[in-house]
């Protein structure tokens, strides 16, 4: 049996923090559960305004943002964050592929993951965005 005790003097690696911004409570709960099982710390927000109001996006290692939300779309939120000089990697969730949104996402170097989510696609994108995960 392997020891789980930390080596004295060794750096302690913290869990990566993933923020989910999606107006569907079932999607938020499902993603939160799945990502926590993978060892991530997950913070869920019901819309862009709630996320911006929380003002803790600098502490996040990766953002998972739904495109279709009331008030502000996912790409609008990402653009707003970039204007605020937040460079946290973001992943856009999209349920209806749209060439205009895809072009904006590509220009912003934001990967798209299509809903419904199947397999490990989202997890793979998060790991690509945060290589130490």
Where are the regions a protein language model picked out?
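Non-catalytic signal-transmission and effector/linker regions of two-component phosphorelay proteins
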Residues: 1-19, 25-26, 32, 100, ...
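Acidic, metal-coordinating helix/loop segments flanking the phosphotransfer/catalytic sites
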Residues: 44-62
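Acidic catalytic/metal-coordinating carboxylates
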Residues: 46-47, 73-76
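Short amphipathic alpha-helix used as the core "switch/output" element in two-component signaling
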Residues: 53, 75-86
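His-Asp phosphorelay/catalytic-motif detector in bacterial-type signaling
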Residues: 59-61, 85-89
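Active-site residues of response regulator receiver
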Residues: 66
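Receiver (REC) domain active-site loop signature in two-component systems and cognate sites
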Residues: 69
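Hydrophobic/aromatic residues positioned on beta-strands within the core alpha/beta folds
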Residues: 93-95
